[in-house]
């Protein structure tokens, strides 16, 4: 059983229940919806069909964020090296071979002579040779084609776009209305961009969690404040590989993963994980290694984009990713758990989480059970990337789905029992029924003062068979009085 989570991009053109069910049973944990390519009606159809398949699949919706795109063209335009092109910021005017219009009116103000403007994910490069008021003059640097509504990147330049477009705001309200689990905000440059989304959520009393997509140099430079302001991070390597030197991507990816682990924040590695499988039934060896290396770096989750949104082999892509993940995890676990320094030496929850993980290695404990109001203890445990799963007992469906982005966490909904004893034994029964544990196995139980707000206060280790033999008549340790806030 894999412990790395899988996010699948889904198009409203292919989102029927049978298709989504196949992806779910192949290993999909989260459905991602890209608002750049789907209408509100299409988004609602994906949501409805996903919830028909399972209430346990998390839903994530993208914003467009502060991006620049070209306007429409009648047909793809062919450019040769040396062609001269004028560029204007006229979002309502179509583009031609001689004049390319872009969606940002002040584009010419923010771009300088000597800058490279990259179109269509870097497929077409134009060098700015002249700037005259609202007009830029560019020279084509490589042969290529330019179609409608293609991405525009200017590496190294700060484009003064607002954090949210009007379409973004409408889609955030749609996410609130539909009770989506995550919003993935695109092109995040600083904590201020995250807070712009959070402000709207707060105004509507929404508990949707924000995933910040790191796609440019500013996002990399400000990563620490962005992590602090976000629920989690997505390393979106497509635009990132255009905005920064491509040879730096592996180092940036590893650094961001490490920072997220230290902050106990979920992290997703995305873009071209199995790109070949859009058209082919098998991946390249390089793609297999890319997935494995992301897992060796201890990512929480991996994302499929075109592979599941429009590819010919979507189910096979998920199955392939799941197999690679499971094999890489088994290899990674031979090296022991991740050493995560305590950020607060007086934090009881951190100390007990580390002790529980160490018990899985030193005492042969086969799993950890914890109950959770918000998922924080489960995320603390996930940060260590232990060899055995964490069973998180959640009292809210939403918390269960939030944990679909946390490594090694099996989140299950369970109604609230009257005592720790009842909750623990019910969890043991469920684990046995699902085949996760046997009577001879040891299990760790991490919990606290029963009820809301008690915090994590004790760690108990029991042999499964002994618990059942006593017919559940065992006593958990006295709960420690603590001033710590609950999760």
Which residues does each predicted region cover?
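Non-catalytic helical/linker scaffolds that mediate oligomerization, partner binding
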Residues: 1-487
């Amino acid at each position: 059983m894999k412990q790395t989570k899988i996010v699948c991009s889904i198009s409203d053109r292919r989102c029927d229940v049978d298709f989504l069910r196949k992806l779910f049973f192949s290993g999909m944990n989260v459905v991602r919806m890209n608002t750049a390519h789907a209408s509100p009606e299409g988004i609602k159809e994906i949501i409805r069909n996903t919830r028909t398949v399972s209430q346990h699949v998390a839903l994530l919706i993208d914003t467009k964020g502060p991006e620049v795109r070209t306007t429409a063209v009648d047909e793809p335009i062919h450019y040769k090296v040396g062609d001269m092109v004028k560029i204007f910021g006229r979002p309502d005017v179509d583009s031609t071979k001689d004049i390319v219009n872009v969606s940002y009116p002040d584009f010419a103000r923010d771009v300088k002579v000597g800058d490279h403007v990259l179109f269509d994910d870097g497929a077409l490069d134009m060098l700015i040779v002249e700037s005259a008021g609202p007009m830029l003059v560019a020279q084509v640097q490589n042969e290529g084609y330019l179609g409608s509504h293609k991405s525009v990147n200017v590496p190294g330049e700060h484009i003064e776009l607002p954090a949210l477009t009007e379409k973004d705001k409408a889609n955030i309200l749609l996410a609130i209305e539909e009770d989506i689990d995550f919003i993935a905000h695109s092109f995040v440059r600083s904590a201020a961009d995250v807070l712009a989304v959070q402000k709207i959520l707060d105004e509507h009393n929404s508990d949707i969690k924000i995933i910040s997509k790191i796609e440019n140099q500013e996002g990399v430079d400000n990563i620490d404040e962005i992590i602090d302001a976000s629920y989690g991070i997505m390393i979106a390597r497509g635009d990132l590989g255009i905005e920064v030197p491509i040879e730096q991507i592996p180092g940036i990816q590893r650094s961001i993963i490490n920072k997220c682990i230290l902050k106990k924040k979920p992290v997703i590695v995305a873009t071209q994980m199995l790109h070949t499988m859009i058209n082919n039934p098998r991946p390249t060896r390089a793609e297999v290694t890319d997935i494995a290396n992301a897992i060796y770096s201890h990512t929480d989750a991996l994302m499929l984009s075109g592979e599941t949104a429009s590819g010919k082999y979507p189910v096979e892509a998920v199955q392939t990713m799941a197999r690679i993940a499971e094999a890489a995890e088994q290899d990674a676990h031979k090296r022991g758990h991740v050493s995560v320094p305590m950020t607060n030496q007086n934090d009881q929850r951190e100390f007990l989480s580390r002790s529980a993980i160490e018990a899985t290695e030193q005492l042969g404990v086969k799993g950890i059970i914890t109950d959770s109001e918000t998922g924080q203890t489960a995320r603390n445990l996930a940060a260590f990337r232990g060899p055995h799963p964490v069973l998180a007992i959640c009292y809210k469906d939403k918390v269960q789905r939030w944990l679909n982005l946390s490594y090694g966490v099996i989140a299950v909904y369970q109604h609230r029992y009257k005592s720790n004893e009842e909750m623990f034994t019910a969890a043991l029964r469920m684990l046995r029924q699902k085949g996760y544990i046997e009577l001879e196995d040891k299990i760790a139980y991490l919990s606290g003062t029963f009820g809301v707000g008690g915090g994590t206060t004790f760690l108990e280790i029991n042999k499964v068979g002994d618990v059942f033999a006593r017919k559940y008549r065992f006593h958990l340790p006295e709960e420690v009085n603590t001033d710590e806030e609950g999760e």
